[in-house]
Amino acid sequence: MKYNQNTKIMQITEKTLIVGVDIAKEIHHARAFDFRGIEYGKRIEFSNDIDGMKRFLKWAADIMNKSNKEHLMVGMEPTGHYWLCFAQFLRDKKHKVVLVNPFHVKRSKEFDDNSPTKNDRKDPKTIAMLVKDGRYVEPNIPEGIYSELRIAVDIREMLTKDLNKIKNRVARWLDIYFPEFNKVFADWEGKAALITLKEFPTPAKILGIGAEEILAAWKKEINRAVGAKRALKLIEAASQSVGKRDGIEMAEVEIKIILEQYEMLVKQLKKIESKIEELFMQVPGANEMLSIKGVGVITAAIFIAEVGDITRYEHPKQIQKLAGYNLVENSSGQHKGQTTISKRGRRRLRSALYKMIMPILANNKEFQELHKYYTTRKENPLKKKQSMIVLCCKLIRVFFVILKKGVKYNGNKMLRDIKRPEIRNAA
């Protein structure tokens, strides 16, 4: 997987036909060039279905026969999800598929005509020229268990977003119709609070039934004792509520629908997380990853889902760059800019690593010692957040070795980064 630009350029020979494809939802556009940038044939438009893809291959094959080319390299932008089917079709036919960064396409499209114009004729050439110059990457399309795991993680992210929207709707509803509710219940997702919202959500309903009926409703589903003081506090809050009273009938219908959606999403989320755990445990090295104190199943599964098969990587810095944790600096002349992380890469991977490092710091002694060392050392002490990012990169290296070499986690090796003055002086 590790190719520098020279290696990428060397893969393109005089026998290679480079095709740049501008991907769209229904109609793709393509142009063909050789390794010097000379165009062959006419631009083609083809549909995003089997007939269109076969037509594309026939067009490319005709050009290759006429120009004495032996290899086809197809470059494209990863536009949304529209490129996936076409890329799979080409890979099934044993043709090389590469991707160019949409940001690079945007920046380089003015080279030929000094114009920011974007159209279906111009973009395929821009893409092909980037490929010709070795400015491409080979797509990391997961297969087998890694593909299943990534899709499962995608589903979990979708459900989590939907659940957050539902939670916000409940919070909005309470702010409008019963703003005092949160003074009685610290969390509306608690059992007693949910029963209240289902059975008697409005102040008028609460005042109409009294404390005994409220307690009886709670005790039906809650085994532990629920205090009468809480019921009296709820009645008092309802009696003093400043919530909106107009349209209250449909407000009750609204909260009922919202809570039904909430319960459905919670159930679906538990189900998909159980499936994620099942899939993750099939990945070689999963148990070794979980042996690190503080590493949870879900965050570890997200790491694997984003990175894919570890054998595709030659160095942990590739994963660090994939996560957007590689360091960048903006300096010129005597001006020395501030060093920051690039944040270019897989957002979910970067987020998972950062979320993972917090419980690790709370539970793992080796990481705690490293964190203390990085933030208190005499030379170049780091701020706490900077140290956490450094530890995220350290965690990447630990995972890389565990998965690549099939070894167990060794906390003592972690501490080799700490420079101990007493040891140096003794030497």
Regions found by a protein language model. Give the residues of each.
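A detector of single, family-specific signature residues
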Residues: M1-A427
